[in-house]
Amino acid sequence: MAGPTFLLEQLSVVLFLCVSFTGANYCRTVPGDPSFPSAEKWNSLNSSVSGRLVKAVPSAQFCSNMHGGCTDAEWTSASFRADIPGAMDQVNWEQDYESVPPSICLRNSTDCGQGNVPLYAILAESVEDVQIGVAFSSAHNLRLAVKASGHDYLGRSTARNSLLISTHKFQNITFAENFTVSGHNAGSAVTVGSGVPLNTLYQAAKEQGKILVSGVAATVVAAGGYIQGGGHSALSPLLGLAADNVLEFEVVTANSTYLKVNEEEHADLFWALRGGGAGSWGVVVSATFRTFPTFNATTSLVSMVANDTVALGSIMATHAKHIFDWDDLSMGQYFYAYENTTADAYMLALASYFPRISSDEAAAALKPFLDDAEQFGQIVGQQFNETNINDGVTTVDDVVGSNTVLGSRLIPASTYRDHPDTFGHVYTQLFDAGAVAVLGHLVAGGKVSENAYIDSAIHPAWRTAKTHIILTNSWADSTSLSNISSIQNAFKDSQLPILEQIAGSPGAAYSNEADSLEEDFKTTFFGPNYPRLEDIKRRYDPKGMFIVAAGVGSDKWDRDGLCRVD
Protein backbone atom coordinates (compact mmCIF):
# COMPACT_ATOMS: atom_id res chain seq x y z
CA MET A 1 0.00 0.00 0.00
CA ALA A 2 1.03 3.62 -0.44
CA GLY A 3 2.82 5.39 2.35
CA PRO A 4 1.52 8.44 4.26
CA THR A 5 3.47 10.97 2.18
CA PHE A 6 2.09 9.59 -1.09
CA LEU A 7 -1.48 9.63 0.20
CA LEU A 8 -1.18 13.15 1.62
CA GLU A 9 0.16 14.38 -1.71
CA GLN A 10 -2.85 12.81 -3.43
CA LEU A 11 -5.26 14.43 -1.02
CA SER A 12 -3.79 17.89 -1.51
CA VAL A 13 -4.03 17.65 -5.28
CA VAL A 14 -7.59 16.32 -5.11
CA LEU A 15 -8.63 19.23 -2.91
CA PHE A 16 -7.06 21.63 -5.40
CA LEU A 17 -8.92 20.03 -8.29
CA CYS A 18 -12.20 20.21 -6.43
CA VAL A 19 -11.74 23.96 -6.13
CA SER A 20 -10.46 24.58 -9.67
CA PHE A 21 -12.95 22.41 -11.61
CA THR A 22 -14.47 24.94 -14.04
CA GLY A 23 -16.44 23.35 -16.85
CA ALA A 24 -15.20 24.04 -20.35
CA ASN A 25 -11.82 25.35 -19.11
CA TYR A 26 -11.05 22.02 -17.48
CA CYS A 27 -8.72 19.51 -19.15
CA ARG A 28 -6.96 16.36 -18.04
CA THR A 29 -3.21 16.43 -17.62
CA VAL A 30 -1.23 15.05 -20.57
CA PRO A 31 2.49 14.57 -21.26
CA GLY A 32 4.20 17.94 -21.63
CA ASP A 33 2.00 19.68 -19.08
CA PRO A 34 3.90 21.03 -16.06
CA SER A 35 1.61 19.04 -13.75
CA PHE A 36 2.03 15.71 -15.54
CA PRO A 37 3.48 13.17 -13.09
CA SER A 38 7.25 12.97 -13.03
CA ALA A 39 9.18 9.73 -13.47
CA GLU A 40 9.66 9.71 -9.71
CA LYS A 41 5.90 9.74 -9.15
CA TRP A 42 5.32 6.96 -11.67
CA ASN A 43 8.02 4.94 -9.90
CA SER A 44 6.29 5.59 -6.59
CA LEU A 45 3.02 4.36 -8.08
CA ASN A 46 4.79 1.25 -9.34
CA SER A 47 6.10 0.53 -5.85
CA SER A 48 2.65 1.06 -4.37
CA VAL A 49 1.18 -1.64 -6.64
CA SER A 50 4.07 -4.05 -6.02
CA GLY A 51 5.71 -3.58 -9.41
CA ARG A 52 2.57 -4.16 -11.44
CA LEU A 53 2.76 -0.90 -13.42
CA VAL A 54 3.87 -1.43 -17.04
CA LYS A 55 4.19 0.72 -20.14
CA ALA A 56 1.34 0.01 -22.52
CA VAL A 57 2.06 -0.30 -26.24
CA PRO A 58 -0.09 -1.03 -29.32
CA SER A 59 -0.38 -4.70 -30.23
CA ALA A 60 1.70 -4.27 -33.39
CA GLN A 61 4.55 -2.78 -31.36
CA PHE A 62 4.23 -5.54 -28.77
CA CYS A 63 4.55 -8.11 -31.52
CA SER A 64 7.55 -6.51 -33.19
CA ASN A 65 9.48 -5.39 -30.12
CA MET A 66 8.59 -7.80 -27.36
CA HIS A 67 7.41 -11.01 -28.94
CA GLY A 68 9.71 -11.41 -31.91
CA GLY A 69 6.83 -11.04 -34.32
CA CYS A 70 3.33 -12.48 -33.93
CA THR A 71 2.07 -15.35 -36.04
CA ASP A 72 -1.22 -14.97 -37.88
CA ALA A 73 -2.81 -17.27 -35.31
CA GLU A 74 -1.62 -15.06 -32.47
CA TRP A 75 -2.58 -11.80 -34.13
CA THR A 76 -6.14 -12.98 -34.68
CA SER A 77 -6.53 -14.66 -31.27
CA ALA A 78 -8.64 -12.84 -28.69
CA SER A 79 -7.12 -15.00 -25.94
CA PHE A 80 -3.63 -13.94 -26.98
CA ARG A 81 -4.64 -10.28 -27.16
CA ALA A 82 -6.27 -10.37 -23.73
CA ASP A 83 -2.80 -10.88 -22.24
CA ILE A 84 -1.42 -7.71 -23.89
CA PRO A 85 -2.30 -4.61 -21.81
CA GLY A 86 -2.48 -2.23 -24.78
CA ALA A 87 -4.21 -4.56 -27.24
CA MET A 88 -7.82 -4.41 -28.35
CA ASP A 89 -9.67 -7.15 -30.21
CA GLN A 90 -10.45 -4.76 -33.06
CA VAL A 91 -7.18 -3.06 -33.94
CA ASN A 92 -8.77 0.17 -35.15
CA TRP A 93 -9.50 1.13 -31.53
CA GLU A 94 -5.75 1.24 -30.91
CA GLN A 95 -5.33 3.92 -33.60
CA ASP A 96 -5.73 7.69 -33.40
CA TYR A 97 -6.93 8.62 -36.87
CA GLU A 98 -8.13 12.10 -35.92
CA SER A 99 -4.98 13.81 -34.66
CA VAL A 100 -2.82 15.85 -37.01
CA PRO A 101 -0.73 14.01 -37.94
CA PRO A 102 -2.51 10.72 -37.15
CA SER A 103 -0.88 8.41 -34.61
CA ILE A 104 -1.08 4.89 -35.98
CA CYS A 105 0.64 1.56 -35.33
CA LEU A 106 -0.13 -1.14 -37.90
CA ARG A 107 1.06 -4.72 -38.10
CA ASN A 108 4.57 -4.97 -39.58
CA SER A 109 4.89 -1.18 -39.44
CA THR A 110 8.34 0.27 -38.89
CA ASP A 111 7.00 3.60 -37.64
CA CYS A 112 4.62 3.26 -34.71
CA GLY A 113 2.76 5.93 -32.80
CA GLN A 114 1.13 5.41 -29.42
CA GLY A 115 -2.26 5.98 -31.03
CA ASN A 116 -5.27 5.59 -28.77
CA VAL A 117 -3.39 3.27 -26.41
CA PRO A 118 -2.88 4.25 -22.74
CA LEU A 119 0.55 5.34 -21.58
CA TYR A 120 0.74 3.00 -18.60
CA ALA A 121 -1.25 0.07 -17.27
CA ILE A 122 -1.69 -1.34 -13.78
CA LEU A 123 -2.04 -5.11 -14.03
CA ALA A 124 -4.20 -5.16 -10.93
CA GLU A 125 -4.34 -8.25 -8.75
CA SER A 126 -6.21 -6.85 -5.75
CA VAL A 127 -8.86 -4.33 -4.83
CA GLU A 128 -6.08 -2.26 -3.28
CA ASP A 129 -4.26 -2.09 -6.63
CA VAL A 130 -7.42 -0.73 -8.22
CA GLN A 131 -7.98 1.80 -5.44
CA ILE A 132 -4.42 3.06 -5.73
CA GLY A 133 -4.76 3.41 -9.50
CA VAL A 134 -8.01 5.34 -9.28
CA ALA A 135 -6.61 7.57 -6.54
CA PHE A 136 -3.44 8.29 -8.54
CA SER A 137 -5.47 9.22 -11.61
CA SER A 138 -7.68 11.51 -9.57
CA ALA A 139 -4.81 13.12 -7.70
CA HIS A 140 -2.86 13.87 -10.87
CA ASN A 141 -5.89 14.68 -13.04
CA LEU A 142 -5.19 11.85 -15.48
CA ARG A 143 -7.49 10.26 -18.02
CA LEU A 144 -8.46 6.80 -16.73
CA ALA A 145 -9.34 3.69 -18.74
CA VAL A 146 -10.50 0.25 -17.61
CA LYS A 147 -10.03 -2.99 -19.53
CA ALA A 148 -11.06 -6.57 -18.80
CA SER A 149 -10.21 -8.40 -22.05
CA GLY A 150 -10.43 -5.89 -24.91
CA HIS A 151 -13.58 -7.48 -26.36
CA ASP A 152 -15.01 -4.05 -27.01
CA TYR A 153 -16.73 -2.77 -30.14
CA LEU A 154 -16.87 0.92 -29.17
CA GLY A 155 -13.29 1.50 -28.02
CA ARG A 156 -14.26 2.08 -24.39
CA SER A 157 -11.45 -0.04 -22.94
CA THR A 158 -8.67 2.21 -24.18
CA ALA A 159 -7.88 5.93 -24.19
CA ARG A 160 -5.13 8.20 -25.42
CA ASN A 161 -2.79 9.67 -22.77
CA SER A 162 -4.42 7.64 -20.02
CA LEU A 163 -3.61 5.31 -17.15
CA LEU A 164 -5.21 1.92 -17.72
CA ILE A 165 -6.43 -0.37 -14.96
CA SER A 166 -6.49 -3.94 -16.24
CA THR A 167 -8.71 -6.41 -14.37
CA HIS A 168 -7.50 -9.36 -16.45
CA LYS A 169 -5.90 -11.05 -13.43
CA PHE A 170 -9.11 -11.11 -11.37
CA GLN A 171 -9.67 -14.81 -12.07
CA ASN A 172 -11.64 -15.82 -8.97
CA ILE A 173 -14.71 -18.07 -9.31
CA THR A 174 -16.75 -18.99 -6.21
CA PHE A 175 -19.98 -20.98 -6.22
CA ALA A 176 -22.57 -20.85 -3.45
CA GLU A 177 -25.81 -22.78 -3.05
CA ASN A 178 -27.21 -20.13 -0.73
CA PHE A 179 -25.74 -16.75 -1.63
CA THR A 180 -26.82 -14.04 0.78
CA VAL A 181 -27.56 -10.45 -0.16
CA SER A 182 -27.63 -8.23 2.92
CA GLY A 183 -28.55 -11.24 5.05
CA HIS A 184 -31.21 -12.59 2.70
CA ASN A 185 -30.85 -15.91 0.87
CA ALA A 186 -30.75 -15.25 -2.89
CA GLY A 187 -30.24 -18.89 -3.82
CA SER A 188 -27.68 -20.59 -6.04
CA ALA A 189 -25.07 -18.20 -7.45
CA VAL A 190 -21.52 -17.75 -8.67
CA THR A 191 -19.21 -14.83 -7.88
CA VAL A 192 -16.87 -14.12 -10.78
CA GLY A 193 -13.81 -11.90 -10.99
CA SER A 194 -13.77 -9.29 -13.72
CA GLY A 195 -11.06 -11.07 -15.67
CA VAL A 196 -12.64 -14.51 -16.05
CA PRO A 197 -13.43 -15.35 -19.71
CA LEU A 198 -16.59 -17.23 -20.59
CA ASN A 199 -14.85 -20.36 -21.85
CA THR A 200 -13.32 -20.78 -18.38
CA LEU A 201 -16.49 -19.82 -16.53
CA TYR A 202 -18.83 -22.16 -18.40
CA GLN A 203 -16.61 -25.17 -17.79
CA ALA A 204 -16.22 -24.32 -14.10
CA ALA A 205 -20.01 -24.08 -13.88
CA LYS A 206 -20.39 -27.44 -15.63
CA GLU A 207 -18.26 -29.08 -12.95
CA GLN A 208 -20.72 -27.73 -10.38
CA GLY A 209 -23.77 -28.85 -12.37
CA LYS A 210 -24.71 -25.21 -13.01
CA ILE A 211 -25.31 -22.80 -15.88
CA LEU A 212 -25.63 -19.01 -15.95
CA VAL A 213 -26.81 -16.47 -18.48
CA SER A 214 -23.95 -15.09 -20.55
CA GLY A 215 -22.69 -14.86 -24.12
CA VAL A 216 -21.00 -17.32 -26.47
CA ALA A 217 -17.77 -15.46 -27.29
CA ALA A 218 -14.85 -17.19 -25.58
CA THR A 219 -13.12 -14.12 -24.19
CA VAL A 220 -16.10 -12.03 -23.13
CA VAL A 221 -15.81 -11.30 -19.41
CA ALA A 222 -19.18 -11.82 -17.73
CA ALA A 223 -18.31 -9.41 -14.91
CA GLY A 224 -16.87 -6.77 -17.24
CA GLY A 225 -18.54 -4.44 -19.69
CA TYR A 226 -20.82 -7.26 -20.84
CA ILE A 227 -23.06 -7.12 -17.77
CA GLN A 228 -22.96 -3.32 -17.51
CA GLY A 229 -24.46 -3.08 -20.99
CA GLY A 230 -27.17 -5.59 -20.12
CA GLY A 231 -25.76 -8.80 -21.56
CA HIS A 232 -27.72 -10.80 -24.14
CA SER A 233 -27.39 -14.56 -24.51
CA ALA A 234 -28.57 -17.54 -26.52
CA LEU A 235 -30.28 -18.45 -23.24
CA SER A 236 -32.06 -15.10 -22.89
CA PRO A 237 -35.41 -16.28 -24.33
CA LEU A 238 -35.34 -18.99 -21.62
CA LEU A 239 -33.74 -17.17 -18.66
CA GLY A 240 -33.65 -13.44 -19.43
CA LEU A 241 -30.80 -11.00 -19.92
CA ALA A 242 -27.64 -11.34 -17.88
CA ALA A 243 -28.49 -8.10 -16.08
CA ASP A 244 -31.81 -9.66 -15.03
CA ASN A 245 -29.80 -12.34 -13.23
CA VAL A 246 -27.04 -10.43 -11.46
CA LEU A 247 -27.30 -10.24 -7.68
CA GLU A 248 -24.35 -8.13 -6.58
CA PHE A 249 -21.28 -6.20 -7.72
CA GLU A 250 -18.03 -5.35 -6.03
CA VAL A 251 -16.85 -2.04 -7.43
CA VAL A 252 -14.27 0.68 -6.80
CA THR A 253 -15.85 4.06 -7.43
CA ALA A 254 -14.33 7.37 -8.52
CA ASN A 255 -13.36 8.37 -4.97
CA SER A 256 -11.41 5.08 -4.61
CA THR A 257 -14.01 3.57 -2.31
CA TYR A 258 -14.69 -0.17 -2.45
CA LEU A 259 -18.42 -0.92 -2.38
CA LYS A 260 -20.63 -3.97 -2.34
CA VAL A 261 -23.58 -3.00 -4.50
CA ASN A 262 -26.92 -4.81 -4.55
CA GLU A 263 -30.66 -4.20 -4.21
CA GLU A 264 -30.26 -3.07 -0.60
CA GLU A 265 -26.81 -1.49 -0.49
CA HIS A 266 -26.19 1.42 -2.86
CA ALA A 267 -29.33 0.42 -4.74
CA ASP A 268 -29.08 3.39 -7.10
CA LEU A 269 -25.66 2.29 -8.35
CA PHE A 270 -26.89 -1.31 -8.58
CA TRP A 271 -29.70 -0.05 -10.81
CA ALA A 272 -27.23 1.81 -13.06
CA LEU A 273 -24.76 -1.06 -13.34
CA ARG A 274 -27.49 -3.27 -14.81
CA GLY A 275 -27.73 -1.86 -18.31
CA GLY A 276 -26.55 1.72 -17.77
CA GLY A 277 -23.52 1.30 -20.00
CA ALA A 278 -20.05 -0.21 -19.80
CA GLY A 279 -17.19 1.69 -18.21
CA SER A 280 -19.20 4.59 -16.77
CA TRP A 281 -19.60 3.70 -13.09
CA GLY A 282 -16.34 2.50 -11.61
CA VAL A 283 -14.00 -0.45 -11.75
CA VAL A 284 -16.04 -3.60 -11.24
CA VAL A 285 -13.84 -6.25 -9.63
CA SER A 286 -16.50 -8.97 -9.37
CA ALA A 287 -20.13 -9.73 -10.10
CA THR A 288 -22.38 -12.39 -8.62
CA PHE A 289 -24.80 -14.13 -10.98
CA ARG A 290 -27.80 -16.33 -10.30
CA THR A 291 -27.11 -19.90 -11.43
CA PHE A 292 -29.46 -22.63 -12.62
CA PRO A 293 -29.19 -26.41 -12.83
CA THR A 294 -27.42 -27.31 -16.05
CA PHE A 295 -29.35 -29.21 -18.71
CA ASN A 296 -28.96 -30.96 -22.02
CA ALA A 297 -29.72 -29.12 -25.23
CA THR A 298 -29.53 -29.48 -28.97
CA THR A 299 -27.40 -27.05 -30.92
CA SER A 300 -27.75 -26.82 -34.66
CA LEU A 301 -25.91 -25.12 -37.49
CA VAL A 302 -27.65 -24.69 -40.83
CA SER A 303 -26.01 -23.01 -43.83
CA MET A 304 -27.90 -21.74 -46.88
CA VAL A 305 -26.75 -20.09 -50.08
CA ALA A 306 -28.70 -17.58 -52.18
CA ASN A 307 -27.70 -16.55 -55.68
CA ASP A 308 -28.52 -12.85 -55.34
CA THR A 309 -29.77 -10.21 -52.93
CA VAL A 310 -33.41 -10.68 -53.92
CA ALA A 311 -33.26 -14.39 -53.12
CA LEU A 312 -31.52 -13.65 -49.82
CA GLY A 313 -34.21 -11.11 -49.00
CA SER A 314 -36.90 -13.70 -49.69
CA ILE A 315 -35.19 -16.13 -47.31
CA MET A 316 -35.08 -13.45 -44.61
CA ALA A 317 -38.75 -12.57 -45.10
CA THR A 318 -39.50 -16.27 -44.70
CA HIS A 319 -37.41 -16.34 -41.53
CA ALA A 320 -39.38 -13.38 -40.17
CA LYS A 321 -42.67 -15.19 -40.85
CA HIS A 322 -41.50 -18.26 -38.93
CA ILE A 323 -39.70 -16.57 -36.05
CA PHE A 324 -42.57 -17.07 -33.62
CA ASP A 325 -42.62 -20.82 -34.39
CA TRP A 326 -39.91 -21.36 -31.81
CA ASP A 327 -41.31 -19.33 -28.92
CA ASP A 328 -42.64 -22.32 -26.97
CA LEU A 329 -39.19 -23.92 -27.18
CA SER A 330 -37.36 -20.82 -25.78
CA MET A 331 -34.90 -21.19 -28.62
CA GLY A 332 -32.04 -18.72 -29.01
CA GLN A 333 -30.53 -18.22 -32.45
CA TYR A 334 -27.82 -16.32 -34.30
CA PHE A 335 -28.75 -15.79 -37.96
CA TYR A 336 -25.85 -14.29 -39.89
CA ALA A 337 -26.21 -13.17 -43.50
CA TYR A 338 -23.09 -12.24 -45.43
CA GLU A 339 -21.67 -11.88 -48.89
CA ASN A 340 -19.48 -14.73 -50.12
CA THR A 341 -17.31 -12.84 -52.58
CA THR A 342 -15.35 -15.90 -53.72
CA ALA A 343 -18.54 -17.71 -54.76
CA ASP A 344 -20.39 -14.60 -55.97
CA ALA A 345 -23.29 -15.52 -53.71
CA TYR A 346 -24.87 -14.73 -50.36
CA MET A 347 -24.82 -16.98 -47.31
CA LEU A 348 -27.06 -17.41 -44.31
CA ALA A 349 -25.73 -19.27 -41.27
CA LEU A 350 -28.19 -20.12 -38.50
CA ALA A 351 -26.80 -21.31 -35.15
CA SER A 352 -29.70 -22.38 -32.94
CA TYR A 353 -29.84 -23.42 -29.28
CA PHE A 354 -32.77 -25.61 -28.21
CA PRO A 355 -33.03 -26.18 -24.44
CA ARG A 356 -33.99 -29.64 -23.21
CA ILE A 357 -35.06 -31.24 -26.49
CA SER A 358 -33.59 -33.92 -28.74
CA SER A 359 -31.95 -33.39 -32.11
CA ASP A 360 -34.97 -34.97 -33.82
CA GLU A 361 -37.28 -32.50 -32.09
CA ALA A 362 -34.99 -29.60 -33.02
CA ALA A 363 -34.90 -30.69 -36.66
CA ALA A 364 -38.68 -30.92 -36.68
CA ALA A 365 -38.94 -27.41 -35.22
CA LEU A 366 -36.77 -25.92 -37.99
CA LYS A 367 -38.27 -27.95 -40.84
CA PRO A 368 -41.25 -25.69 -41.71
CA PHE A 369 -38.96 -22.68 -42.07
CA LEU A 370 -36.32 -24.58 -44.04
CA ASP A 371 -38.90 -26.13 -46.36
CA ASP A 372 -40.27 -22.68 -47.20
CA ALA A 373 -36.81 -21.10 -47.45
CA GLU A 374 -35.63 -23.70 -49.96
CA GLN A 375 -37.86 -22.05 -52.55
CA PHE A 376 -35.30 -19.24 -52.64
CA GLY A 377 -31.98 -20.85 -51.74
CA GLN A 378 -30.12 -24.08 -51.19
CA ILE A 379 -29.22 -25.74 -47.89
CA VAL A 380 -25.52 -26.56 -48.10
CA GLY A 381 -24.93 -27.72 -44.55
CA GLN A 382 -26.98 -28.99 -41.63
CA GLN A 383 -25.73 -30.27 -38.27
CA PHE A 384 -27.51 -31.16 -35.03
CA ASN A 385 -25.70 -31.97 -31.82
CA GLU A 386 -27.12 -33.11 -28.49
CA THR A 387 -24.88 -31.81 -25.73
CA ASN A 388 -24.65 -30.34 -22.28
CA ILE A 389 -25.62 -26.66 -22.58
CA ASN A 390 -22.34 -25.56 -20.97
CA ASP A 391 -20.45 -27.23 -23.81
CA GLY A 392 -22.96 -25.89 -26.32
CA VAL A 393 -22.20 -22.27 -25.47
CA THR A 394 -18.45 -22.73 -24.91
CA THR A 395 -16.06 -21.69 -27.67
CA VAL A 396 -12.28 -22.08 -27.63
CA ASP A 397 -11.28 -18.62 -28.90
CA ASP A 398 -12.56 -15.63 -30.86
CA VAL A 399 -11.15 -14.59 -34.24
CA VAL A 400 -10.23 -10.90 -34.04
CA GLY A 401 -7.41 -8.58 -35.10
CA SER A 402 -9.25 -6.69 -37.85
CA ASN A 403 -10.40 -3.09 -38.29
CA THR A 404 -14.14 -3.24 -37.63
CA VAL A 405 -16.94 -0.98 -36.45
CA LEU A 406 -20.57 -1.85 -35.83
CA GLY A 407 -24.02 -0.34 -35.98
CA SER A 408 -27.15 -1.97 -34.60
CA ARG A 409 -30.81 -1.77 -33.65
CA LEU A 410 -33.25 -3.74 -31.56
CA ILE A 411 -36.12 -4.92 -33.75
CA PRO A 412 -39.59 -4.87 -32.18
CA ALA A 413 -41.63 -8.07 -32.05
CA SER A 414 -44.51 -6.08 -33.52
CA THR A 415 -42.58 -5.55 -36.76
CA TYR A 416 -42.12 -9.29 -37.17
CA ARG A 417 -45.78 -9.86 -36.41
CA ASP A 418 -47.24 -7.12 -38.60
CA HIS A 419 -44.71 -6.58 -41.42
CA PRO A 420 -42.63 -9.72 -42.02
CA ASP A 421 -42.25 -9.04 -45.74
CA THR A 422 -40.46 -5.77 -44.96
CA PHE A 423 -37.48 -7.78 -43.69
CA GLY A 424 -36.92 -9.12 -47.18
CA HIS A 425 -36.90 -5.63 -48.68
CA VAL A 426 -34.52 -4.38 -45.98
CA TYR A 427 -31.98 -7.18 -46.43
CA THR A 428 -32.02 -6.75 -50.20
CA GLN A 429 -31.53 -2.99 -49.91
CA LEU A 430 -28.74 -3.33 -47.36
CA PHE A 431 -26.69 -5.72 -49.47
CA ASP A 432 -27.42 -3.79 -52.66
CA ALA A 433 -26.06 -0.71 -50.86
CA GLY A 434 -22.80 -2.50 -50.09
CA ALA A 435 -23.35 -4.17 -46.72
CA VAL A 436 -20.94 -7.05 -46.13
CA ALA A 437 -22.58 -8.77 -43.15
CA VAL A 438 -25.88 -8.45 -41.29
CA LEU A 439 -25.77 -10.32 -38.00
CA GLY A 440 -29.11 -11.25 -36.47
CA HIS A 441 -29.57 -12.34 -32.85
CA LEU A 442 -32.77 -13.96 -31.62
CA VAL A 443 -32.02 -13.13 -27.97
CA ALA A 444 -35.18 -11.35 -26.86
CA GLY A 445 -38.80 -12.21 -26.29
CA GLY A 446 -39.74 -14.96 -23.85
CA LYS A 447 -38.21 -14.37 -20.43
CA VAL A 448 -36.69 -11.07 -21.54
CA SER A 449 -40.20 -9.73 -22.11
CA GLU A 450 -41.55 -11.38 -18.96
CA ASN A 451 -38.86 -9.63 -16.91
CA ALA A 452 -40.22 -6.17 -17.75
CA TYR A 453 -41.16 -5.83 -14.08
CA ILE A 454 -37.48 -5.75 -13.04
CA ASP A 455 -36.41 -2.21 -12.17
CA SER A 456 -33.02 -1.69 -13.81
CA ALA A 457 -31.33 0.56 -16.35
CA ILE A 458 -32.06 -1.87 -19.21
CA HIS A 459 -33.51 0.07 -22.15
CA PRO A 460 -37.29 -0.62 -22.08
CA ALA A 461 -37.10 -1.49 -25.78
CA TRP A 462 -35.49 -4.80 -24.82
CA ARG A 463 -38.78 -5.87 -23.27
CA THR A 464 -40.72 -5.47 -26.53
CA ALA A 465 -37.95 -6.50 -28.94
CA LYS A 466 -37.63 -9.80 -30.74
CA THR A 467 -34.13 -9.54 -32.20
CA HIS A 468 -30.94 -7.52 -32.13
CA ILE A 469 -29.45 -6.88 -35.59
CA ILE A 470 -25.88 -5.72 -36.23
CA LEU A 471 -24.19 -4.43 -39.36
CA THR A 472 -20.41 -4.70 -39.57
CA ASN A 473 -18.10 -2.41 -41.53
CA SER A 474 -14.41 -3.22 -41.92
CA TRP A 475 -11.33 -2.03 -43.76
CA ALA A 476 -7.80 -3.11 -44.59
CA ASP A 477 -4.70 -1.51 -43.08
CA SER A 478 -3.91 -0.03 -46.50
CA THR A 479 -7.18 1.94 -46.63
CA SER A 480 -6.78 5.72 -46.91
CA LEU A 481 -7.82 7.95 -44.02
CA SER A 482 -10.62 9.50 -46.06
CA ASN A 483 -12.03 6.10 -46.93
CA ILE A 484 -11.70 4.97 -43.32
CA SER A 485 -13.82 7.94 -42.30
CA SER A 486 -16.45 7.01 -44.88
CA ILE A 487 -16.55 3.43 -43.62
CA GLN A 488 -16.78 4.56 -39.99
CA ASN A 489 -19.78 6.70 -40.92
CA ALA A 490 -21.44 4.19 -43.25
CA PHE A 491 -23.91 2.94 -40.67
CA LYS A 492 -25.44 6.30 -39.81
CA ASP A 493 -25.10 7.75 -43.32
CA SER A 494 -26.49 4.95 -45.48
CA GLN A 495 -27.38 1.79 -43.57
CA LEU A 496 -29.43 3.13 -40.67
CA PRO A 497 -32.10 4.77 -42.87
CA ILE A 498 -32.71 1.35 -44.41
CA LEU A 499 -32.65 -0.51 -41.10
CA GLU A 500 -35.15 1.94 -39.62
CA GLN A 501 -37.81 0.45 -41.91
CA ILE A 502 -37.94 -2.46 -39.44
CA ALA A 503 -36.46 -0.83 -36.32
CA GLY A 504 -38.50 2.36 -36.29
CA SER A 505 -37.25 5.87 -35.55
CA PRO A 506 -36.09 6.82 -33.04
CA GLY A 507 -35.00 3.27 -32.41
CA ALA A 508 -33.06 1.57 -29.66
CA ALA A 509 -29.78 -0.33 -29.65
CA TYR A 510 -27.75 -2.63 -27.41
CA SER A 511 -25.01 -0.29 -26.25
CA ASN A 512 -22.25 -2.94 -26.18
CA GLU A 513 -22.60 -3.76 -29.88
CA ALA A 514 -23.39 -0.51 -31.58
CA ASP A 515 -22.08 2.57 -33.36
CA SER A 516 -19.77 4.71 -31.22
CA LEU A 517 -20.78 7.65 -33.45
CA GLU A 518 -24.47 7.26 -32.61
CA GLU A 519 -25.74 10.84 -32.83
CA ASP A 520 -28.48 10.55 -30.20
CA PHE A 521 -26.88 7.96 -27.96
CA LYS A 522 -28.90 9.10 -24.95
CA THR A 523 -32.15 8.02 -26.58
CA THR A 524 -30.80 5.09 -28.60
CA PHE A 525 -28.81 3.41 -25.82
CA PHE A 526 -30.69 4.46 -22.69
CA GLY A 527 -34.11 5.83 -23.62
CA PRO A 528 -36.16 7.22 -20.72
CA ASN A 529 -33.56 5.99 -18.23
CA TYR A 530 -30.98 8.62 -19.19
CA PRO A 531 -32.01 11.43 -16.78
CA ARG A 532 -31.85 9.05 -13.82
CA LEU A 533 -28.52 7.65 -15.02
CA GLU A 534 -27.12 11.15 -15.33
CA ASP A 535 -28.19 11.93 -11.77
CA ILE A 536 -26.49 8.77 -10.46
CA LYS A 537 -23.39 9.63 -12.49
CA ARG A 538 -23.18 13.03 -10.79
CA ARG A 539 -23.55 11.38 -7.40
CA TYR A 540 -20.83 8.74 -7.80
CA ASP A 541 -18.53 10.35 -10.38
CA PRO A 542 -18.86 14.14 -10.17
CA LYS A 543 -15.47 14.75 -11.84
CA GLY A 544 -16.07 12.39 -14.75
CA MET A 545 -13.31 9.91 -13.97
CA PHE A 546 -15.10 7.21 -15.94
CA ILE A 547 -15.89 8.69 -19.35
CA VAL A 548 -16.32 6.42 -22.38
CA ALA A 549 -17.56 6.84 -25.93
CA ALA A 550 -21.34 7.35 -26.01
CA GLY A 551 -21.53 6.67 -22.29
CA VAL A 552 -23.42 8.57 -19.62
CA GLY A 553 -21.89 12.03 -19.25
CA SER A 554 -19.69 11.72 -22.34
CA ASP A 555 -21.47 14.60 -24.07
CA LYS A 556 -19.77 16.93 -21.59
CA TRP A 557 -16.30 15.93 -22.84
CA ASP A 558 -14.41 16.01 -26.14
CA ARG A 559 -13.94 12.86 -28.22
CA ASP A 560 -10.82 11.85 -26.26
CA GLY A 561 -12.36 12.44 -22.84
CA LEU A 562 -9.59 14.92 -22.08
CA CYS A 563 -11.31 18.32 -22.01
CA ARG A 564 -14.77 19.36 -20.93
CA VAL A 565 -16.90 21.02 -23.59
CA ASP A 566 -20.00 21.99 -21.61
Where are these predicted regions, by residue range?
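Hydrophobic h-region of N-terminal signal peptides that target proteins for export
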Residues: 14-22
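Soluble FAD-dependent oxygen oxidases
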Residues: 2-6, 21-566
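Classical eukaryotic N-terminal signal peptides for Sec-dependent ER targeting/secretion
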Residues: 1-15
